Amino acid sequence: MQSRRAVCAAALCLAVVPAHAATGGSGAFRGFIESLRPDAAARGVSAATFDAAFRGVSGPDAAVLARIRQQSEFVRPVWDYLVGAVSDGRIVRGRARAAALAPTLAEIRNRYGVPAPVLLALWGIESDFGASAGSVPTVRALATLAEARHRGSLFRDELLAALTILQRGDVTPARMSGSWAGAMGQVQFLPSTYLAHAVDFDGDGRRDIWSSDSDSLASIAAYLKDLGWDPAVSWGYEVALPEGFDLSRYAADIDDFAKRGVRRTDGKPLPGHGRASLFLPGGSGAPVFLITDNFEVIRGYNTSDSYALAVGHLADRLDGGPPLAAPWPAAGARLDGPGLRELQSALAAGGFYEGPQDGRAGPRLREAVRRYQISADLPADGYATPALLSRIKDRSGSRP
């Protein structure tokens, strides 16, 4: 299935769009649009729907192309991201929405098994509870991305999916809007994700993620359920580790962590069942989390570790939980995009990393860092730092 993870991956490819594609004339752009007509018709899109969708779309969106070029090197530390994503104002607004929508949220949980705080947290981060759903016309944005990335099919397929939505009558071209990358409405679904997972919860005959709170929240819940959400466990917990804790044993049953002295920072007991793994997004001495498979489900919505952590922590705060107990590391103790690419290359040369050298942090790089740290008899926190990169380069003889 396509999801917003596809946008994250594709943005890196789009960052290298050739100049001639980014500045192509309107004639070439219109030619590209016309080339879509046979495939759209094969999907059941009528000529009238096709023409209505592209009425007034005479050329690519320059603002979208500018966002592509800005995207590639943008790496934000998790602690900076959390400041905005889990702000006091958002917590207040989210709790107010929770009270106003309590009956609807209860019905959605009964049907899909996803708790209200998680739904509200996702909704809050995606569109500030529906207040900031994005105003970029989806068809033009996707056409711009598809034409600029003509050798790839992702955005072309998403554009055809958007036309299918219009054909089905869930929304008009004028109301189909969202982000610059084609993610739509209050829940920021790509069109293919919408077709696969959006639901008509209020029963009005339309899956309306643009103006219906209940459809939006239920669509989030349906998507998480389809991604594998487990109603029996949380997303994770902030924990404190005992002195001398062996970080190399970072994945185990939750009760095993409890037996090894791991404790929740809020004083509540860990559950007695389920699997989990340690996540140290700021390295040793920063907040430590015990994350479950539901954390990975959230990453299915958006692959960013920072995003998944923000959703989980905001959900806890909306549910009355405390702020994080441990402080974050000092500014500068992290690698940016070019530094992460260099680290990926160095780890790959040593046989620790297999994967794209894309300058993106994530589970694959985290595991590679841990393997190196274990081999070097270092604390296996999985955290990529400038000091770690310098150590690897010094020992490999790659430093100039």
Give the positions of each predicted feature:
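Short acidic, glycine/serine/threonine-rich helix-capping segments at coil-helix boundaries
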Residues: 335-340, 345-392
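Catalytic glycan-binding domains that act on GlcNAc-containing polysaccharides
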Residues: 45-273, 287-289, 298-337, 359, ...
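Boundary at the C-terminal end of the N-terminal hydrophobic targeting segment
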Residues: 19-23
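Bacterial N-terminal signal peptides
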Residues: 9-15
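Intrinsically disordered, low-complexity Ser/Thr-rich linker and spacer segments
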Residues: 392-400
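N-terminal export leaders
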Residues: 4-8
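Mature N-terminal segment immediately following signal peptide/propeptide cleavage
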Residues: 28-51
